Amino acid sequence: MEVPADSSSCLQVKRVHSLSVLKNKVSCFFLTIYWANALSRDSARVAGLDSEVRVRRDCELREGGMPSVLGTLDESMAEDAFGLGVDGYSEGASMFTADVTRLGRPLRRRAAGGDAGRAGEGAGAAGGLGRGGEARGGAAEAAETAEALDFQPPPSKLFAGRVERPISNDSIVTEAAETLSTHFDMSASTSSSSRGSSVVIEKSQAHEAAEESATGAPCKKYLFASSRDRLQLSLGGMEASLSSLHIPAAGADAGGAVHSVASFSRTAPALVTTSKALTPSQRYRLRREQNKVALQNSIKQREVFYEEQERGSRGRSASLKGVLGLPHAVDELSEDISDYLGWDVPVVSPTTGPFLAAAERSEKHTDRRPGVARSRSSTYVDHTMPPSPIPGIQKTSDLEFFTETSKKLSCVYLDTSKETSKSKLYERSQSAELLPIEFKAASDEGMEDLKLVSSGKMAVCSNSRPSWLPPKDTEERARHERQIRQTIDIASLSQIDRTKERAERDTRDEKNRKRLAQLVERGLVRKSTLTELKKICWETSLPPDSRFQIYTTLLQSDTAKLIEEQYIDNFDQVDALFRSMQFPNAKLAEIQAMLACTPCTANVAPADDLIYLLQLKAISRQGLLLGDPLLVHHLLQVGCYSTREIWVLVNILQLTCFNETTKDKYDRRIISSRGTVSTALSADKTFAQEFNSKCLNFTTWWHLMARLDHAVFMWCLDIIVAENSQPFKSNPIIRDKLNGKDWDYYRDLHVVVNYRIICALTLTVLLSYHFGFNNLYDLSFVDPAFQIIGPEQGDLGDVHATFIKKWHHNYKKF
């Protein structure tokens, strides 16, 4: 730009230019604040104004020099914004123009005074002070008039870092130029989106600006709208004048140049043709605008759905304009929907919701607008009904619309929660089985529910450590669990072995019983038969129904039965004697005291047969002997013998197996220092206090037998009888030789005195079952319920078999 020769005029131009720029900034600042408040306060009122009123007010404001923002601005608004009337504002109107866009679009400012000043400078540079000088003069006068106003400029520090370069009319195209088209036909509104920005059309000849500044009556046209539909409503019938509008170039050199308003599309920005080269800042802004437009186009190409909705909306809007005669209502509806779409809010209206079924109208609805025919099948839309988010046009409210969905979701969530809770409780119930016994006892007492025990507690709890001790560390826990598993494996193998042995024992018992029946039929008088019988007795107890026959055969021969005939009192005679006499009370008291000291009869009422047989035994020739209560009691427990048979068996057993000779030998040999018992007990010094005649005698042996249960007692009795048998075939009983002989003579010839078998039994108890008592003498004072081999130790079959095996092993030592 060429600087004028006159320095005073140059300084004046610079000052006017600076003041113009400053005033433009101050005015735009206050105008921005005003419209930020005015848009939020008066948006509903402005949107409801009639199109004719808006056009009339726009014309009035343009005549007064007040720019039209969003289509309307009255005098009161101007007074509120600047404290001036329309006339006062018109004085400074030539200094600036403002463009405020809708929905947060950037504010565009255009300094008309600066354009006029630059036009004047261009004219001066051309070599004259013609219309350009006049324009400078008009600008100076406008500046002086503006200085008279009460505007207080902001502090200079706000503008110290930013001095904008004046922008000429032919610089670059802004966003407002993109929405401008040379044809403002009504039918052209359906070709692009309604999201356009404000359009500013002005006459920019420099000489006309100078004339207008001198007269104070600007003739500029400011059209602010948010879409082409708003532009159509604002312009009204001015399409012809705008379509033929042309702007000549400023300056004398450019008198023949014609600048036509180019046709701008939404896809490519169009620039106003100019003969001047762009400055670097203009090229930079040009590239920035082009990039912005390209980005917008790229976004629009991806918004296929919304573009289709807009095209459908415009098509239906155009049809409704002709049918209903309500163009402004349809335009506003389409515009509002476009605003929703700009913010990606799905909305629906009766014209833009073809996918929604038409709501059934109530027959009682009588609110009909006069002059408009409505029908059930029509697409009439009440223009007062704003578009709303889906499903706003339904009869039901949003709450009712989503009630069913929310109920289903709630059911799903509740079911899922219940199933999850059940699975967690099931897992914890399963894991609770592995907790220590102390935890289970605490749970039973109500201290804590094991079903609520978490995995964290399970991690520190162990069956092998009490709960009051610190938890095990990882290594110790793993080591103990490994040892426990090994122990369990060994126990499992032992259990497998025991199960196998039980099965083998059952098979063996069945086989032995069959073999025993064959031996009884063959006769128990041979030595070979007795050997096999003894083996069977060590493995299997005798059948209860065969005991009487086997006992009498083994102890007195099956043919002679001399003991029963000569050395035992006849049962019938003793019974007759008992019935014919008064039994002494002292003797009865003695019998009851004996039964009270016997463990197997101490806690139960003695049977009548037991007392009866003991009374008979008391009045017999042998008298009541040690062991009679036990023998009578267990034989009665068998349940298959009569009182006569029990009488015979008890007397035979006392005369043969437990006679005086056996008793004497047992008492001497059990405590012999060179005997088998002494040799076995001497290895353990703890038996030194028991190895005496007080603890080891025939009486204490019966104390031992009283602590055995019925099954093992009878099995032991079977073995003792078998070991006291003899082969009567090789040593037969000759009745003639024994006639008139006493019992001692008969015992020496035909009775086997086997004390070793009962000594082996005592040794077995002392070595393997010495639990719960100090010695055999104190055993009689122990609780009557105590048993040496009791059911609490496991399966009786296994326990009894183990006891018999150990007894047999110790018997072999004798």
Swiss-Prot record:
One family name in Pfam for this protein: SBE2_C
Keywords, in A-Z order: Cell wall biogenesis/degradation, Golgi apparatus, Protein transport, Transport
Bias-annotated ranges (Low complexity): 137-149
Localization (cell): Golgi apparatus
Comp. bias intervals (Gly residues): 114-136
Its biological purpose: With SBE22, is involved in cell wall integrity and polarity processes like bud growth.
Entry protein name: Protein SBE2
Organism: Eremothecium gossypii (strain ATCC 10895 / CBS 109.51 / FGSC 9923 / NRRL Y-1056) (Yeast)
Gene: SBE2
